[in-house]
A protein has these predicted regions:
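A short, structured beta-strand/loop element
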Residues: 5-45
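Long, charge-rich, low-complexity alpha-helical segments
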Residues: 29-84
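Hydrophobic packing positions characteristic
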Residues: 1-2
Length: 84
């Protein structure tokens, strides 16, 4: 796999963080930030937690892309939940 960009703020590079989605120019995992959002941290607190390496527009982009992924794969997720 080669380096790919998703939107303005997200990239994946097999040489960085084992090829997991990160915020461009950082080693901050998208999944970690989504977890912080899910745990109720404010966006300002998330930005502080990430030492200012990400921005509000970057967090918004991640949430939008997560929403698109859920919408695209909703049937798969429902099947997985039903089998648990």
């Amino acid at each position: 796999m080669k380096k790919k960009s998703f939107g303005r703020f997200i990239s994946v590079d097999p040489k960085i963080c084992h090829g997991k989605l990160c915020f461009r120019g950082t080693r901050i995992l998208v999944s970690d930030v989504l977890e912080l959002v899910a745990n109720g941290l404010s966006w300002d607190d998330i930005i502080k937690e990430c030492h200012g390496s990400i921005s509000r527009p970057a967090i918004a982009e991640v949430i939008r892309l997560a929403g698109l992924a859920i919408a695209e794969h909703a049937d798969d997720y429902l099947e997985r939940l039903a089998s648990v």
